[in-house]
Amino acid sequence: MKAPRQQSLFPKLCEDTAFPKPVNVASVPQRSPFRYPGGKTWFVPTFRDWIKNYSPKPEILIEPFAGGGIISLTALFEEFVSRVVMVEIDEEIAAVWQSVVDGHAEWIAKRILSFELTKESVIDEISRTNVDLREKAFQTILKNRTFHGGILAEGSGFLKYGENGKGIRSRWYPATLSKRFSNLKLVADRILFCKDDGLEVIQEYSRRQDVVFFIDPPYTAGGKRAGKRLYRHFTLDHERLFTLCESVKGDFLMTYDNADEVKMMARNHGFQMRLIPMTNTHHATMQELVIGKDLSWMDRYAAVHEPIAEYKTEGKRKKVPTRRSIGRGKP
């Protein structure tokens, strides 16, 4: 049976525009020491296209849900902003970024190089309690690099097979990780790190016109379960987030799960939406939503067609028709 033709999100573009391919993350400078679930390395080229349009350039970039921090680090290393504010509420991830800001990046780099990694040595190390901040940061990196998918949330465990049967050594690259931490020393004095609620920090900076936000919240809207599985702190008031974004005097760029509830909130707050392709951890091509005040700079991108998707909501499964174009705030 022939599949029905899907509508373009950008109907004004020509019909024969090639379907865009997901970004090959190997082509993007790897700045973050984390192998982070839901990381945004693949989004870096799009982020560059957005932020380079500003003249004068923004003073500060705020990442209220920093996680692996690749967007903030890109903004610093490539001189898109003078400073960044990185916000993360998870205490283990926070330990890493706070250690970097406090001047312990080189200590962590050397600790990584000297560590003899076996399953037993990792268990011994991460079982230690009453450790100081930099030791906690090292424990976090160990877990992130040896646990399945880099997931730190409760219930995660060691890689069993990994790449080519290497098990927990599959993602442990001491020289590479050490160099990434050493490089972080170059920008550490331009990072303000806050272990805090991202929504509170958005509100704090909302009146500043020289500030831009990159917002990548945990995906739990509409009963989505990925955020609950991947992150320790997954509870989020999504409606409040959209309300805060509407109040910011500067600008923001948000990435979100392609869910009907999210699109409804974006329309209700008058935001524009676009879809962008990405490859998930299972190497399947998916689409994520890009949300902002003005996404006209994305109009030169190739058209992205929205698939007919089945969304799982709390209590029941239902098919959500997605044939409508996601235009500039169209209802």
Residue positions per predicted region:
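Long, positively charged, glycine-interspersed low-complexity recognition regions
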Residues: A3-P11, H233-P331
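SAM-dependent nucleic-acid methyltransferase catalytic core
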Residues: K2-I51, S55-P56, A94, V100-F214, ...
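Short active-site oxyanion
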Residues: P58-L61, V81-R83, A188-L192, E246-F252
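Short His-Asn-centered micro-motif
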Residues: P64-F65, V87-I89, C194-D196, I215-P217, ...
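A residue-level signal for conserved active-site and pocket-lining positions in enzyme catalytic cores
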Residues: G67, W97, I141, F252, ...
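Short, surface-exposed loop/helix-turn segments at secondary-structure junctions
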Residues: G227-H233
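Conserved S-adenosyl-L-methionine
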Residues: P56-L117
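Short hydrophobic/aromatic-enriched beta-strand-loop microsegments
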Residues: R83-E88, A109, F214, G270-M278
